[in-house]
């Protein structure tokens, strides 16, 4: 037994080399070996290998070991970055069992740390020799490198950060390779001689991006200087360059967030001392920084920040940038290299075939500003110009429309994160806008197409948000857009008035600048408005089918409708966040009002939602929970859940100026990877027809079933309004104020109208379903846990479809910003049918008319309609027919909000093109050719019109009486094309389409 232990001990020593007294087992086939005290990473010596040209170094004679779970670890020092290739082969006898390619692309110490199962060959084997082969980029060059702290059979370091020395082998590594993968991207922009304009603009940028000077504190500076003097010793060469010094632990385990903060702030304190000309600070600063860089606290070192790490990098990176003015050019180059290493700078160099799939809004938010600083502050002008151009391209690329659910922008103007439209995460827009503003007036500004795409995204934020009424920056979204942060940061606009104004003033493209100024004036009336542009109103209906939502707005109100699909979740539930939020977007219809907080919209203002009935989300159809624990995924406060549909994708909107449609085939899944809730098998066809100031809601085919308790009703929720000082109006039912009296059931055999305290009116016709009205105090949990509750007074109402229903339906009308007298008048008109007519309400089609408008929500192919001129369609889509009696013209708008997702290897899924063919009664032709619309020659008294739908976008076309003398094309191509024109008014450019005028971003001019 003792012999076995001794043998084990000898084997362990034999596989470890520190080179303090010898270099046994190491033999240079070419060049020379020597123990050296010049550089070391352990003890006071290392092994120096000096050679010329291609050379080999062999390690043999140690006790063989099994290459399975353990790793090879060593420190390798390079006096300069050469780009040489060092091949390391692990042998069993003469057979090569593992091969590593180590690139000599750094200066100083770096780790060779690699598991034996991180190679092309991973079979079980014994290792009894190593062979190093150095292939220099210059065959005649003499090279020196140093080895230290070699452990051939080391314990694996699972937390190591592979440096850029592994750019050729990182695909084999089983740790986080994000940084080295970016470093492996080919730098495809050459360093060229800058133009006079580029040099001038570079100086402008350097002035704008100059880091903030570190704050001086005599105590902190003295403490930092004393620490360096007491803990750091360095030896310098005759020319002043660093030779060696105190060993610094640069393993990933040592470089914690706290240690990074300590190191960077210590450097800041010393830099502040240099600024104040404090004696000894310059020497301490240089000694400390030079030693850090030499020891591997540098580019390619063991430092990495996750792209969603928002604390540590915000301290470390600005601190490192702030010391640049106090660095020598060599120090600047290396510090900038470190900053690039940790701020994802390599993302600027994704290849043409990979960059689109790698857009990440977290990287934009966290790192874009630092990327731009690192580029501009490079001391070499030509390199700085090249680097700024790389960041400029990165910015332009990040405005591209990414297919599927990837970050960041979509064709309809929505911003994506976590695979869906997520306004709360579009704080990336702040960083992007700041970078755009930094580039103002320079030749490095992003191109017009990129600027326009980003401007459209900003415009979309303010279209979705409540109007200004109070604080200029207090804007809120519907709670259905709150993600996992309901009634808190998730519903607050994460963009500022100043930034929107900056985007307008910085814009170098005249037409686009005009539109941005108009958007700013419309979003912030009376707040430093631009006086050189025509007025613009945000009122109207908008569609965002990558959300999918409809937005209707007028005056001081905005209404938002939303539902989930199989690709876009309607609610995101995280550990300790939004635990009861699964119903946020179940066909929601939320009416909100401008104000300093959410109280004006009847929402809780406590940032937690405690006191809000999570069952009753306005507009939704839900199965009410009677036990809050059951409403959490798996009944816990930690399990994750994303609320998708159960495979259906027909949900979204059609907008045509002041009218529009929202529709959803709502199917609720209760699983996410695995079952998370007791299934209720909830289904419903839900639609909302928007006619300027009223919204007609129609539901059909509502069903629910399962083993859940019979005390859980299925309901379509009208509203919930939290009573507060800002929302203290009475609840009115059929003209009578309701006291806080608990619950009442309205007679379903008659029409009923209600006026919520927020001033939103509701009218319901006679129905077989009961209408429940509740007014009083309610105690409910916060969104974080069922253990914390709150009590609020609420007025709420919902349609009770019964416990488990089949084939239930509903109709109701929503009138925003009204009062009791107006609602009484509306109720009379709604009741006698003079305001609107529901023409069809079944599993295939919801159709509603008002005035000269007929809206169709086709849930499937349909035929046999006897109203209007539409007789059939071949697939699901939305359609609005507006008849102009004076010209006998039918003005159609159509879209398919179903993106028909198709699996894609690169993007997960992509939207696909679809077509639908309408059959119109009568003989019709297109008033003008329109892209994606093709009229067939009328036959047998009917006309077929084929529509092509892409990306959820609408098509607009006019049908006029067929004129045989006008001629008719033989192919679809003959009847397609785009006929729009530009119009200039007061020096401002607009687009005219279908007789309507739009800004260059597509916003209708009122």
Regions from the PLM with identified roles:
Residues 428, 435-923, 927, 939, ...:
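Extended polysaccharide-engagement surfaces of secreted carbohydrate-active enzymes
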Residues 28, 49-71, 91-101:
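Secreted extracellular polysaccharide-interacting domains
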Residues 13-30:
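Extracellular carbohydrate-recognition regions
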Residues 35-54:
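Short carbohydrate-recognition loop motifs
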Residues 19, 72-75, 111-151:
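Extracellular beta-strand ligand-recognition surfaces/modules
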Residues 83, 93-126:
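Extracellular carbohydrate recognition and processing domains
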Residues 965-1006:
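C-terminal outer-membrane/trafficking sorting elements
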Residues 204-478:
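Aromatic-lined, polymer-binding surfaces characteristic
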């Amino acid at each position: 037994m003792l012999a076995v232990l001794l043998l084990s001990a000898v084997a362990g020593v034999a596989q470890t080399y520190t080179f303090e007294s010898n270099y046994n087992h190491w033999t240079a086939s070419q060049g020379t070996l020597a123990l050296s005290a010049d550089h070391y990473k352990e003890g006071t010596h290392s092994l120096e290998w000096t050679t010329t040209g291609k050379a080999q170094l062999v390690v043999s004679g140690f006790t063989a070991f099994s290459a399975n779970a353990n790793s090879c670890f060593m420190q390798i020092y390079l006096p300069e970055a050469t780009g040489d290739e060092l091949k390391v082969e692990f042998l069993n006898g003469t057979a090569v069992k593992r091969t590593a390619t180590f690139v000599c692309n750094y200066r100083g110490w770096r780790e060779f740390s690699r598991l034996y199962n991180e190679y092309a060959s991973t079979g079980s084997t014994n290792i009894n020799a190593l062979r190093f082969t150095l292939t220099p980029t210059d065959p005649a060059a003499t090279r020196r490198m140093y080895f230290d702290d070699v452990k051939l059979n080391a314990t694996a370091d699972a937390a190591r950060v592979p440096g850029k020395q592994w750019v050729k082998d990182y695909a084999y590594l089983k740790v986080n390779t994000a940084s080295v993968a970016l470093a492996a991207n080919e730098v495809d922009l050459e360093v060229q001689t800058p133009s006079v304009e580029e040099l001038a603009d570079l100086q402008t940028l350097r002035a704008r991006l100059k880091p903030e000077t570190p704050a001086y504190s005599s105590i902190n500076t003295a403490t930092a200087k004393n620490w360096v003097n007491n803990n750091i010793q360095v030896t310098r060469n005759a020319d002043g360059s660093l030779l060696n010094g105190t060993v610094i632990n640069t393993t990933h385990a040592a470089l914690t967030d706290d240690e990074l903060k300590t190191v960077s702030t210590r450097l800041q304190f010393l830099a502040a001392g240099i600024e104040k000309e404090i004696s000894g600070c310059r020497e301490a600063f240089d000694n400390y920084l030079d030693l850090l860089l030499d020891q591997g606290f540098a580019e390619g070192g063991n430092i990495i920040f996750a792209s969603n790490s928002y604390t540590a990098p915000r301290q470390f990176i600005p601190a490192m940038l702030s010391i640049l003015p106090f660095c020598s050019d060599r120090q600047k180059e290396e510090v900038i290299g470190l900053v690039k290493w940790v701020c994802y700078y390599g993302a600027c160099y994704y290849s043409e075939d990979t960059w689109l799939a790698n857009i990440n809004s977290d990287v934009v938010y966290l790192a874009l500003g630092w990327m731009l600083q690192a580029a501009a502050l490079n001391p070499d002008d030509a390199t700085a110009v090249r680097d700024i151009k790389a960041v400029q391209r990165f910015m332009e690329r990040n405005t591209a429309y990414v297919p599927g659910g990837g970050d960041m922008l979509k064709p309809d103007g929505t911003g994506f994160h976590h695979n869906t439209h997520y306004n709360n995460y579009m704080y990336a827009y702040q960083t992007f806008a700041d970078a755009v503003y930094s580039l103002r007036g320079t030749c490095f500004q992003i191109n017009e197409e990129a600027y326009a795409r980003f401007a459209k995204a900003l415009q979309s934020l303010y279209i979705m948000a409540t109007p200004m009424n109070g604080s200029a920056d207090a804007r809120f979204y519907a709670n259905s857009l709150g993600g996992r942060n309901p009634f808190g940061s998730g519903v607050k606009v994460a963009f500022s008035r100043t930034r929107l104004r900056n985007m307008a003033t910085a814009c170098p493209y005249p037409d686009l600048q005009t539109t941005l100024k108009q958007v700013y004036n419309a979003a912030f009336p009376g707040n430093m408005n631009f006086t050189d542009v025509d007025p613009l109103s945000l009122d109207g209906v908008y569609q965002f089918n990558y959300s999918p939502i409809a937005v209707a707005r007028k005056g001081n109100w905005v209404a938002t409708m939303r539902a989930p699909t199989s690709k876009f979740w309607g609610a995101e539930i995280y550990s300790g966040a939004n635990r009861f939020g699964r119903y946020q977007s179940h066909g929601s219809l939320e009416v909100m009002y401008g104000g300093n907080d959410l109280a004006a919209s009847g929402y809780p203002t406590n940032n937690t939602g405690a006191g809000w009935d999570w069952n009753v989300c306005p507009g939704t159809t839900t199965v009410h929970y009677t036990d809050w624990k059951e409403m959490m995924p798996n009944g816990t406060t930690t399990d994750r859940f994303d609320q998708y549909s159960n495979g259906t994708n027909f949900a979204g909107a059609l907008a045509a100026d002041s009218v529009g449609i929202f529709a959803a085939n709502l199917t609720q899944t209760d699983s996410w990877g695995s079952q998370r809730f007791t299934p209720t098998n909830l289904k419903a066809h839900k639609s909302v027809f928007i006619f300027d100031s009223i919204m007609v809601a129609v539901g059909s085919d509502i069903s629910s079933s399962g083993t859940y308790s019979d005390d859980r009703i299925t309901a379509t929720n009208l509203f919930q309004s939290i009573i507060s000082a800002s929302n203290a109006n009475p609840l009115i039912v059929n003209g009578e104020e309701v006291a806080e009296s608990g619950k009442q059931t309205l007679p379903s055999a008659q029409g009923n109208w209600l006026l919520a305290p927020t001033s939103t009116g509701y009218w319901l016709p006679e129905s077989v379903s009961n209408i429940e009205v509740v007014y009083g105090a309610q105690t409910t949990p916060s969104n974080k846990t069922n253990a914390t509750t709150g009590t609020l007074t609420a007025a709420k109402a919902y349609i009770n479809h019964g416990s488990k229903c089949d084939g239930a339906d509903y109709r109701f009308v929503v009138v925003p910003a009204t009062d009791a007298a107006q609602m009484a008048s509306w109720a009379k008109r709604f009741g006698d049918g003079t305001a609107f007519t529901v023409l069809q309400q079944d599993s295939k089609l919801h159709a509603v008319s008002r005035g000269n408008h007929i809206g169709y929500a086709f849930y499937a192919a349909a035929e046999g309609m006897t109203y209007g001129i539409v007789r059939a369609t071949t697939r699901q889509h939305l359609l609005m027919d507006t008849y102009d009696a004076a010209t006998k013209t039918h003005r159609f708008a159509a879209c398919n909000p179903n993106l028909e997702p198709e699996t894609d290897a690169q993007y997960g899924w992509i939207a696909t093109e679809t077509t639908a063919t309408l059959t119109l009664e009568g003989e019709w032709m297109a008033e003008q050719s329109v892209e994606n619309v093709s009229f067939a020659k009328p036959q047998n008294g009917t006309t077929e019109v084929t529509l092509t739908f892409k990306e959820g976008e609408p098509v607009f076309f006019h049908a006029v009486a067929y004129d045989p003398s006008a001629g008719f094309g033989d192919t679809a191509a003959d009847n397609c094309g785009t006929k729009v024109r530009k119009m200039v008014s007061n020096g401002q450019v607009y687009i005219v389409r279908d007789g309507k005028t739009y800004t260059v971003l597509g916003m209708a001019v009122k």
